[in-house]
């Protein structure tokens, strides 16, 4: 194994991802692709002080811009199926060139790929209970039977963002519903690159867990990357909770346990989900949780001219994310705390329409509980919503185990959870995986046409907004970010 060395180091101004201010950080770029930032210059290169920022430049695209400040550069890459951006600026054009050259050199040196397969023609079986091993093998072995845009009916725009769209689709051959995320290649892959960006990210590592949305297909057209993901048809948890206003502790415990099980699985693979919030939780036909990956930007991607722009839902942001410190797995336990608080208390733990005030509450305000909550539930929520990630329940080295061993989950057999042996407290009234009663009527009735074989790009639905004007995302019961 080659020894990791520091390729370049120095002060950069990094723009906050949510609170759009510039913060000085001392960055080290290493030969293994890690790009780590500290508040102070480290005494020694091998010091163990935890960095505030820890990124990788593998498979990244670099861009330069003079907005919102001169000598700015942006690093963009794909994380799972989501585009993320980080923005930096330096004092001179020469300094910017030096950094960009060094980053590009490291990124290029990491590209030792096996030639051959086109990595974006990808097909896998569904991890649902009905899939047998035999079916799975057949699905994988048929991977060369190409999936195309024409294999689907396009029903409804679920979300729209700077880099792409998410559309509810129905597979013509099976009648099954999926969410298709369509991203423009040009924003992810530099002109001289082929679309292997995606394989180097975690997309094709085929995350398999009963409570995580599986990626069913990934394929490409000449200018788009398409990800086809499961779309559970038991309705959004947001919809069910807003109808009932509050869940019993028993019901919240069931959903919480399934979320914990999924997070334990992701964390064991060094994946921080980062986006636990009510609108990313759906129910399958039997009433089990499905955590989705339909987001279009998990980071604060914004038009360089606006200083205060949000991507997603600021109510769910953990204190360490707001302070732009590096966040680890504990950020997911904060997210779990927020959604479980909503389930059991019927409202968000911190809320204000004014974002500045909201951030103040998240960072400073003590958590309050309704009197009706049991001591176990209060203790769990207080632990998950600790401001300091190191003090937070789940924030220690044993991660999910801390949460699983909390007395609120005393009655839970965790092996039974992952094997779906626990009876869901609520069963959606759907008769099959193609029953659409929890979908909006407006889009189950008819299909929208967006894919003539050779010229789907020219159709309005797939045309993206101009880079100069980035739309913000709204959320309703059927539109996620």
Curated annotation (Swiss-Prot):
Report the residue ranges that make up the AGC-kinase C-terminal domain in this protein.
410-481
- The organism's taxonomic lineage, starting at the top: Eukaryota, Metazoa, Chordata, Craniata, Vertebrata
Q: What is known of its domains?
A: Binding of the PH domain to phosphatidylinositol 3,4,5-trisphosphate (PtdIns(3,4,5)P3) following phosphatidylinositol 3-kinase alpha (PIK3CA) activation results in AKT2 recruitment to the plasma membrane, exposition of a pair of serine and threonine residues for phosphorylation by membrane-associated PDPK1/PDK1 and activation.
Source organism per UniProt: Homo sapiens
Kindly provide the name given to this protein in its UniProt entry. Answer: RAC-beta serine/threonine-protein kinase
Per its UniProt record, what CDD domains does this chain match? Answer: PH_PKB (cd01241), STKc_PKB_beta (cd05595)
Q: Which UniProt keywords apply?
A: Acetylation, Apoptosis, ATP-binding, Carbohydrate metabolism, Cell membrane, Cytoplasm, Developmental protein, Diabetes mellitus, Disease variant, Disulfide bond, Endosome, Glucose metabolism, Glycogen biosynthesis, Glycogen metabolism, Glycoprotein, Kinase, Manganese, Membrane, Metal-binding, Nucleotide-binding, Nucleus, Phosphoprotein, Proto-oncogene, Serine/threonine-protein kinase, Sugar transport, Transferase, Translation regulation, Transport, Ubl conjugation
How does the record say this protein sits in the membrane?
Peripheral membrane protein
Q: How is its activity regulated?
A: Phosphorylation at Thr-309 (in the kinase domain) and Ser-474 (in the C-terminal regulatory region) is required for full activation. In adipocytes and hepatocytes, the activation is induced by insulin. Aminofurazans, such as 4-[2-(4-amino-2,5-dihydro-1,2,5-oxadiazol-3-yl)-6-{[(1S)-3-amino-1-phenylpropyl]oxy}-1-ethyl-1H-imidazo[4,5-c]pyridin-4-yl]-2-methylbut-3-yn-2-ol (compound 32), are potent AKT2 inhibitors. AKT2 phosphorylation of PKP1 is induced by insulin.
Reported impact of residue 474 to A: Impairs interaction with TTC3
Q: List the disulfide bonds.
A: 60-77, 297-311
Q: What superkingdom does the record give?
A: Eukaryota
Q: Which reaction does it catalyse?
A: L-seryl-[protein] + ATP = O-phospho-L-seryl-[protein] + ADP + H(+); L-threonyl-[protein] + ATP = O-phospho-L-threonyl-[protein] + ADP + H(+)
UniProt modified residues of type N-acetylmethionine = 1
What Pfam families does this protein map onto?
A: PH, Pkinase, Pkinase_C
Q: What is its main location?
A: cytoplasm
- Gene3D superfamilies for the chain: Phosphorylase Kinase, domain 1, Pleckstrin-homology domain (PH domain)/Phosphotyrosine-binding domain (PTB), Transferase(Phosphotransferase) domain 1
Record's subunit section: Interacts with BTBD10. Interacts with KCTD20. Interacts (via PH domain) with MTCP1, TCL1A and TCL1B; this interaction may facilitate AKT2 oligomerization and phosphorylation, hence increasing kinase activity. Interacts with PHB2; this interaction may be important for myogenic differentiation. Interacts (when phosphorylated) with CLIP3/ClipR-59; this interaction promotes AKT2 recruitment to the plasma membrane. Interacts with WDFY2/ProF (via WD repeats 1-3).
């Amino acid at each position: 194994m080659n020894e990791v060395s520091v390729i370049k180091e120095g002060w950069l101004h990094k723009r906050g991802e949510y609170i759009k201010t510039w913060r000085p950080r001392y960055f080290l770029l290493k030969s293994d692709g890690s790009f780590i930032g500290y508040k102070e210059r480290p005494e020694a290169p091998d010091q163990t002080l935890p960095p505030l920022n820890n990124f990788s430049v593998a498979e990244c695209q670099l861009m330069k811009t003079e907005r919102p400040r001169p000598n700015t550069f942006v690093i963009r890459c794909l994380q799972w199926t989501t585009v993320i951006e980080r923005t930096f600026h330096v004092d001179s054009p020469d300094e910017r060139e030096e950094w960009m050259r060094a980053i590009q050199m490291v990124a290029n040196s990491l590209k030792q790929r096996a030639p051959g397969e086109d990595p974006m023609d990808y097909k896998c079986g569904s991890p649902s209970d009905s899939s047998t091993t035999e079916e799975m093998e057949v699905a994988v072995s048929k991977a060369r039977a190409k999936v195309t845009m024409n294999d689907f009916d396009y029903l409804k725009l679920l979300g729209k963002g700077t880099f792409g769209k998410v559309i509810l689709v129905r597979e013509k051959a099976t009648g099954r519903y999926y969410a298709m995320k369509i991203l423009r290649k040009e924003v992810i892959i530099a002109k001289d690159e082929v679309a292997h960006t995606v394989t180097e990210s975690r997309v094709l590592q085929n995350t398999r867990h009963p409570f995580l949305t599986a990626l069913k297909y990934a394929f490409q057209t000449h200018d788009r990357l398409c990800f086809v993901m499961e779309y559970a048809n038991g309705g959004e948890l947001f919809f069910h909770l807003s109808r009932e206003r509050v869940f019993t502790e028993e019901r919240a415990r069931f959903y919480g346990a399934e979320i914990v099980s999924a997070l334990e699985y992701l964390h064991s693979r060094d994946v921080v989900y980062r986006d636990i919030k009510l609108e990313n939780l759906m129910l399958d036909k039997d009433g089990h949780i499905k955590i989705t990956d339909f987001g279009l930007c998990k980071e604060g991607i914004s038009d360089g001219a606006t200083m205060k722009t949000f991507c997603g839902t600021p109510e769910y942001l953990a204190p360490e994310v707001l302070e732009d410190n590096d966040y680890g797995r504990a950020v997911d336990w904060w997210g779990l705390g927020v959604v479980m608080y909503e389930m059991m208390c019927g409202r968000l733990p911190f809320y204000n329409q004014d974002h500045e005030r909201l951030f103040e509450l998240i960072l400073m305000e003590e958590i309050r509980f309704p009197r009706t909550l049991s001591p176990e539930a209060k203790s769990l929520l207080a632990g998950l919503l600790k401001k300091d990630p190191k003090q937070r329940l789940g924030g220690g080295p044993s991660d999910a185990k801390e949460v699983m061993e909390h007395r609120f989950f005393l009655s839970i057999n965790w092996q039974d959870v992952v094997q779906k042996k626990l009876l869901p407290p609520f069963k959606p009234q759907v008769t099959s995986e193609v029953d659409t009663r929890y979908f909006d009527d407006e889009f189950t009735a008819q299909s929208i046409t967006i894919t003539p074989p050779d010229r789907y790009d020219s159709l309005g639905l797939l045309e993206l907004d101009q880079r100069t004007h980035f739309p913000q995302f709204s959320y309703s019961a059927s539109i996620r970010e």
